[in-house]
């Protein structure tokens, strides 16, 4: 928003950084084929319409450019992830019963199969690689409870009191699973890397 943009410009006024305000669906402030690398950190799953985002990304990439993104992975591949998810959502849905009925973004982005097909439709002359990985976070139960909650948008709709109660339950879960005072939270992720092949005309 305007206030965030103003603050960013003020804080980096003496640097070479340049800030532009826009949406991922429309970045006309940038010229065609003007970026070597475009990185999207966990935002692609929230974007709708996502096809316009991908079209814009393709327009901005140079011939051998790279588009990389971190996207939610398969929850069944990460031990303990669903347990943490269920603790958080139990608290949220006790206050907001309909929360989670509708997911944000395009559902095709939420599975590796749907994502592969979606990317192939836009990035015709690119190599597309989707790699499932898990990220492990290790800390004392109290610290890990707060860190893990921060990865779930649902936790931010709770009041301070309800949020604190949720953290208490998360801490209890991590205490029960700790080893030598340290617990682990595992998050499933799909790593998307799209590379331009170059060396010829692209299909548009």
What are the roles of these predicted feature ranges?
Residues 17, 35-36:
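Local beta-strand N-terminus motif with an aromatic residue
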Residues 1-29, 52:
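Class I SAM-dependent methyltransferase SAM/SAH-binding core
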Residues 104-204:
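Conserved Class I S-adenosyl-L-methionine
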Residues 36-51, 73:
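A short SAM/SAH-binding and catalytic strip from SAM-dependent methyltransferases
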Residues 13, 48, 62, 120, ...:
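Short conserved AdoMet
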Residues 51, 58, 64-137:
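Conserved catalytic/acceptor-binding region of the Class I
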Residues 9-12, 88, 119, 174:
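Conserved hydrophobic residues forming the short capping helix/wall of the S-adenosyl-L-methionine
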Residues 20, 39, 68:
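Conserved Rossmann-like nucleotide-binding pocket used by diverse enzymes
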